[in-house]
Amino acid sequence: MKKILAIGIILLTTTLAQAQTKWEWKQMTAIESVVPAGLGRSRLITTDDKGEVVEIKLENFFSLVGINFQNVKDNDRVITESIAKMYDNGWELFNTTSGVYGADRSTGIFITRYLFRKEKK
């Protein structure tokens, strides 16, 4: 009986401790254009510590001849470096959501939202 009571108390205190954790939240959004001939605008958007919007230019997926794999590679590098900087600053990647929008078959965007959290001090 004492063991069951002890286990119950441990479970209750760990649950309460987790429920009291307060988080800071930060979002980073990658918008990658799928407009032929590289005419679209692709950006990585976040906010700095002062609340100012920061836009990092990304390359468009398409050039005049089709998919530009070097641009895809460059965008992957920029996004990965940005995520690594967030980790270095104590942020944890909590959730990722992606979507695609296209008004017709020749244009559109890929959008990915990265939600980070950090425990408030």
Language-model region placement:
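Terminus-proximal functional modules
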Residues: I4, G8, T13, Q18-K121
